[in-house]
Every structure is written in structure tokens, then in C-alpha cells.
Amino acid sequence: MKRTYKFFWIILIALIPLLPSSGWNFSIDVSDVGFNMNQYRFCFTDMDSTYLPLFLTNILGGCLLKVFGILHIPAYIGMETAWAAVCFYLCFLSYRLYVRYREDALILPALAFAMVLAKCNFHFFIYNTAVAFMALTGLYFLIRAVNDKKSGMLFFASAFFM
């Protein structure tokens, strides 16, 4: 029974980002999507037109756009896919962090709820996604450094926090 319970929540977490947004009665915020797509497109060609506080996100988004262009994937679908991949990564890392302290019966429903909130908020690779990626990865290395008493992990944590 416990295995079926875990399997149900894991499947639910995996399906939430894959659901089409139109079925949730949300519209796409064209202004933010257009702003971010242009930032990603122009970050390598015209740095004067990019918003410098989002420099790292622009570099990541520009690299992703180049990869999607090579693979002939439409840019918007590619950025939604990148968002889903980052969300899966964040859920996996959160699970790895919390599994030492809590049981699966509490962690998996909380992660599914967090995934629903993330899907309702925005389902496109933007600065919030990049910041969450960097912050949680840094937190993971920091907790590993403190708990396992490995000072080398502090270097990785500080790199992601910067």
C-alpha cells in the first residue's frame, strides 16, 4: 500500500507540468513572455538592449534558445519544456533534502501542491525559475556541507548563492 501511495504522488507530480495551460483557464501573459524572449534573443548580439539585472537569466535563456534552434524546437515550447525540467529538478532536490527529516507521506503531497502553485503562477522559463534553481541547489550543497561535515561542499554552495 505504501508503495502505491508513493507511486500515485510521483505520477501526479510528473503530470502537473505536462498539462496544457489552456485547460486551466489561464491566459498567457504575452508581455512577460515577449519581454523575456527578446532578452534571450538579443543577449548575445545587442547587450545594450538587455536588462542587466537579469544578466545570468538572459545568458541561460539565450543558450537554451540556441539549443532549441539547433534541435528545431519552437522557442515557446522549448521554454515551457525548460521550465518543466527545472521544476522536476527542484522537486527531486527538495525530496532529497526533506527525506532525511520527514516521511514520504508528508513530502510527496507537499511537492505536488507546490507544483500546482508553480503551474498556476507561470509556466515559462523566466528569472524566477533561474533563481529557484540556483537557490535550491546552493541550499542543497550547504545542508550537505553542514550535515556531512564536508567543507568542499561549501565551495559549491557559495558558487550557487552568488
Spans of features found by a protein language model:
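Transmembrane signal-anchor helices characteristic of membrane glycosylation enzymes that use polyprenol
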Residues: 3-30
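Extracytoplasmic catalytic/substrate-binding loops of multi-pass membrane glycan-assembly enzymes
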Residues: 21-39, 46-64, 70
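Membrane-interface starts of transmembrane alpha-helices
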Residues: 70-82, 105-108, 153
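Transmembrane-helix motifs of polytopic, lipid-linked glycan transferases
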Residues: 81-101, 137
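Transmembrane-helix signature of polytopic, membrane-embedded enzymes
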Residues: 92-116, 149-152
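Short acidic/glycine- and proline-prone juxtamembrane loop motifs at membrane-interface regions
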Residues: 122-132
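Specific aromatic-rich, kink-prone transmembrane helix
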Residues: 130-148, 161
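Membrane-interface alpha helices of multi-pass inner-membrane proteins
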Residues: 152-162
